[in-house]
Amino acid sequence: LVIRRLTSSKTQLLGLRPSILHGLLILLLVISFSVLTFALALRWIISDNIPLSNGYESMLSVAWFSMLITIVMAFAMRSLRLLIITFGFLLSGFFLLVSHIGQMDPAIGHIMPVLNSPLLSIHVSIIMMSYALLALTFICGLTALILSALQRMRGCLQTGLEQSTALMTLSRIFLYPAMTTLGLGIFIGAIWANISWGNYWSWDPKETWALITFMVYAVLLHLQSVPALRTPKYYHIYTTIAFLTIVITYFGVNYVLGGMHSYA
């Protein structure tokens, strides 16, 4: 939908004016967000714990944060509304799909006593928000690369560059709060670990990969020191590849590497 809208000179799409299409998409997103909020609230009430105790609930939470960020950004940046809304649908839909794969257990159970801490709930919530924001930078990068390839095939190099630059700007808008929340989430997690386990950092696989993820994305905050990343093309390639660190941090650690965080 986004690619067709950005590469077509027509003002209408699917026979609808842009304003009507945007309104319908926002309405659908708000309805989806409300249903997911209701579902998470029910799990919270039934279990008497914030729904972040296992992989299934954390995926639902990432989808919830993706929808929330999308709704806020859609109203804040009207000129990019279609792009932002579509990204939100793609991300939240992907996370909801992943939550229903065979490895995820949707059963509501009792939380481990050591995990029943307000600090842990804050830590996981902030980390999930950062993952949602960084996933949006990944979608920006992937979309920019696809659009650039399409415009190159059509011989519209200048148009492709303009679109890539706009997506780079949007990606950096997501990047700064993502890095802030990721750093804050790791910091709060270290405090909770010291209270629960007696040490701030134990080089557990997830701790190590969370630090690697933070360092990989921190490179994007220093564009003045890395001239190549000032170019939209290389910036988007970097953000697309960098997302693999999040995939390893979440899925690789949980289902392959193990460790104390394998329950999360």
Positions of PLM-derived features:
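Hydrophobic cores of alpha-helical transmembrane segments in multi-pass integral membrane proteins
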Residues: 1-8, 22-49, 53-108, 122-149, ...
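Membrane-interfacial, low-structure loops and terminal tails that flank and connect transmembrane helices
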Residues: 9-20, 151-170
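Hydrophobic alpha-helical bundle architecture
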Residues: 200-204
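Active-site/ligand-binding-proximal alpha/beta "capping" segment
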Residues: 111
